[in-house]
Every structure is written in structure tokens, then in C-alpha cells.
Amino acid sequence: MADNKDISVLIVDDNDMTRETLRVILRHDGYNVVGEAMDGDGALEMATRLHPDIILLDVVMPKVSGIEALKSIRMVMQDVQVLMVTANKDQETVTEVVKSGISGYIIKPFNAKKVLDTVQVVALKVRASRSGKAV
């Protein structure tokens, strides 16, 4: 297991199984999963309370979409790293997600390697930012 406990992660997805899968993958690799939310409103509340380093944020959720939640989160936390999680591969969605100022995205269905590879790139940015180095 890697030593990633210095990186805190918030998981936001309306699907219980997806949240559980991401939690297991990340914790197995040593990441500190500090919270989980089921919708965009919960994402904003937990992000402002917990100040995670990384947020894994589903694009399509009831009430408030991931993209709308991201806009709200960015208003109060400009530096948080956000990885969007989506099952939608169409170019329009990917373009909208990328334009929203994210650090990357994970396409569903995903596997542990894809999740960990993507999160590791962002974790390196977090660590570099803490030490004042550019990535």
C-alpha cells in the first residue's frame, strides 16, 4: 500500500455502489477519504467543512449537477483539485467538464488502475503546491 494518507479526498456520487467502490480503491491505496456526499448540495457543504485536497465529483446527480456544484465549490475553494466522474463520453459533455476548471476526469465504468493513476497525478499537484513547486 502506498503512503498517501497526507492526501484527503471527498467522494460525491448519487450511486451508493460507486461511492463504495471509489472509497475501497482509494483507502486500499492509502488515501484519506474524509467524507462522502450523495448530491451537489452535500458536496458544497462537506467541501467547505472538510477542506479536502481532492474532490471526486459525479457529473450527473439529482437536484444539483456536478458541474453546478463545482461552480459553487470554486466560489469558496479556488485551489481544491476536482476530478469529475462521468459515464457520459460524448464530446459535448467532456468539453463542458474540462472547461469548468477541473484537474481531470474519470470515465465510468472505471477500474482501480484508472482511478489510482488519475488520482496520483492530482496528488502530485497537491504535494507540489504545498512545497511551493510548480508541476
Each model region followed by its residue ranges:
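Receiver (REC) domain active-site loop signature in two-component systems and cognate sites
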Residues: 61
